[in-house]
């Protein structure tokens, strides 16, 4: 990786240390991504505060790249595998009744936002409009989720 990117990445990791509560979600990937140019482009985009969309055929390394990026940034990973029944409550969270109280059980998107994690949205092309709509404000300039 280019030296300037490596330095900025190290600065990022020092400035944004993961919360102790989620460090178990930071795991070294079992497979190393091979593709320096793509890795550098993704790291540069993320360091600029951009989102990264990985598109391609099956078994082309998209998830491996995402896992490797999360490891490089030392961020917790939250993965959503979309299917026809994935809705907004699956992503953001839903109310549950626990111990005589109604509590919010946060979903992976809300947890990734709370802890500064990488949210890997796998097979997002399978998502219903309801599920995609809640992502808009999180992914655009607002960087905001109303829960």
Name the predicted role of every residue range.
Residues 1-147:
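AAA+ P-loop NTPase catalytic core and its hallmark functional loops
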């Amino acid at each position: 990786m280019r030296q300037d990117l490596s330095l900025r990445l190290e600065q990022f990791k020092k400035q944004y240390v993961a919360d102790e509560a989620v460090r178990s979600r930071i795991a070294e990937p079992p497979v190393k991504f091979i593709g320096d140019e793509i890795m550098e482009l993704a790291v540069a985009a993320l360091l600029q505060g951009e989102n990264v969309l990985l598109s391609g055929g099956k078994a082309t390394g998209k998830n491996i790249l995402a896992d490797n990026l999360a490891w490089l940034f030392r961020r917790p990973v939250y993965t959503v595998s979309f299917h026809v029944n994935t809705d907004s409550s699956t992503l953001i969270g839903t109310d549950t009744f626990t111990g005589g109280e109604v509590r919010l059980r946060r979903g992976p998107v809300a947890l990734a936002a709370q802890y500064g994690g990488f949210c890997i949205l796998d097979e997002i092309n399978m998502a219903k409009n309801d599920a995609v709509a809640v992502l808009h404000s999180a992914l655009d300039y607002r960087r905001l989720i109303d829960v």
